[in-house]
């Protein structure tokens, strides 16, 4: 079992090498059509499994095609990792789509939709702002 420091170092090396492989070595048009970028790599403590999280820019069809292309390229990527890194055993590689950027942009869009409501309430003074009260003093609005 590898130390946490070694696991993190191997994950970073795999991330760097796979990014380079995706950029220059994979000729599959499906992978290039979706603008694939590596978000994170998680390596198991025994260094046997590597989960590579990718973010794919594009519509749903391009994302699906890019994931199919990555699945087809997985044996090639694993072989390249084995040749480029000096590891006793080459980890099994799995590509997973990271949708956190999509969720984050959806949350930001929702917040932007709510902004006019909050600004209108702030201008009309509908909601009372919190008052600074020292500890032990009674709140003038009657609340505790």
From Swiss-Prot:
Assembly and oligomerization: Monomer. Binds 30S ribosomal subunits, but not 50S ribosomal subunits or 70S ribosomes.
Record's protein name: Ribosome-binding factor A
Family annotation (Pfam families): RBFA
Any single GO BP term: maturation of SSU-rRNA
InterPro entries linked: KH_dom-like_a/b, RbfA, RbfA_dom_sf, Ribosome-bd_factorA_CS
Protein family membership: Belongs to the RbfA family.
Gene3D superfamilies with a match to the protein in the record: 3.30.300.20
Coiled coil: none
GO CC annotations, alphabetized: cytosol
Keywords (A to Z) from UniProt: Cytoplasm, Ribosome biogenesis
Annotated PROSITE patterns: RBFA
Compositional bias ranges of the Acidic residues kind: 128-138
């Amino acid at each position: 079992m590898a130390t946490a420091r070694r696991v993190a170092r191997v994950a970073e090396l795999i991330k760097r090498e796979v990014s380079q492989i995706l950029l220059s070595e994979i000729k599959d048009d499906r992978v290039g059509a979706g603008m694939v970028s590596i978000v994170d790599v998680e390596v198991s403590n025994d260094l046997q499994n590597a989960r590579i999280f990718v973010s794919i820019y594009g519509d749903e069809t391009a994302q699906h095609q890019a994931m199919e292309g990555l699945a087809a390229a997985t044996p090639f990527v694993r072989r390249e990792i084995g040749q480029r890194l000096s590891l006793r055993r080459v980890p099994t590689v799995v590509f997973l789509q990271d949708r956190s950027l999509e969720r984050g942009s959806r949350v930001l869009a929702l917040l932007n939709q709510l902004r006019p409501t909050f600004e209108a309430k702030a201008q009309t003074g509908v909601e009372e702002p919190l008052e600074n009260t020292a500890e032990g003093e009674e709140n003038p609005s009657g609340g505790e």
